[in-house]
Amino acid sequence: MFLKKTIETSEHAESYYAASGSWQTDYPELEGELSVDVVIIGGGFSGVSTAVELCEKGYKVALVEANRISWGASGRNGGQLIGGMGHNPDSFIRTIGRDGVEAIYQMGDEGVDIVKERIEKYGIDCDLKWGYCEAGLKPRHLRAYKKWAEEDEDIQLLDKSQLGEFINSDLYLGGYYKSNWGHLHPLNLCLGEAKAAENMGARIFEQSTVKKITYGNNPAVYTEKGTIKA
């Protein structure tokens, strides 16, 4: 399978995160042939996290990234370390039931726990700060927060006076607070996870756009200058 041409760019977009990154990665371009258990395409959160998980389980891993590690949305997002659904759960209950909604909330909190544990385990410096507050401007926002609180016992609902303990504004009607959600530097998190994977033996390649993938009994990934068999 041949892949469509990708955007021809390689360095991080100008942003606060890029300007304050822990370091500038300099992983080599893939050249020659390499054989591994698993090859991962893409050096964002999904790819780098998968590399860490597989290395922890003893797999021989290679990762190829067309630009820099965490070059795309993984390195330039809001940095919120949160779970939840972002919408009133009622519409989801009609489709997947209350058990499905509860499973989504549980998976979200488990995801936060995984990131927390990984930061601690590998000593990743990514400016993690705990505590998350959301404020509502309209009564419908408060109604939504109340619904969320019914699904999540860790949500602390705030009235207008209580909200003043968290933000210096009187524009909002109320909100909610969660102590086990937080904020971090997403680029530094992804860079730290890549370093953790590398230290466990993962081979990481940048500036290595995948041009072709073959499947079947002899799967392989092809770049301009190299091939990885997996």
Pin down the residues of each PLM region.
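Extreme N-terminal leader/targeting segments of oxidoreductases
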Residues: 1-38, 56
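Helical element adjacent to the flavin cofactor pocket in flavoenzyme catalytic cores
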Residues: 143, 171-230
